[in-house]
Amino acid sequence: YAYREKYDYETEFEFGQRVANELERKIEELGSQNVMAFVAEPVVGATLGAVPAVDGYFKTIREICDHNGVLLILDEVMCGIGRTGTLFAYEQESIAPDIVCVAKGLGAGYQPIGATICTDEIYAAIKNGSGFFQHGHTYIGHPLAAAAANAVLDVLLEDNILEKVSGLGAHL
């Protein structure tokens, strides 16, 4: 991240481009046919203290992934569902991942729940393939958790909570 890794002569944008291009070089080294996905947190959570990527970083990462046929998977378990002023943190870079994982904001502390959201293309591949997505956890598909998540999303969107988060975030 920029605090420790940015050279004195670089702007934050230049730093972001330099480290994003490290992905391009690694994909070239390995061969794009050997790289399935790039996984990252748009806002690094527990290991760094809620630090977002520098502007432009994820836009370049998206371009690199698209150019090489590599999926972009974003982990928004901690930062997603309104916690950054947009429904998803990645929206602030005007990109969309192929797969995004969300959790904590989805239940808003009322009920533990998580979700994996994917593009229509990935969904169709699963549906038209085996039609089965293998996963399993004790509380998977719990109706109370799903109802709580629906209620959280309703309030978040209907009560303009995202606008309030953006305003308060700018103030803080």
Segment roles from a protein language model:
Residues 1-172:
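Conserved N-terminal phosphate-binding loop of PLP-dependent enzymes in the Aspartate aminotransferase
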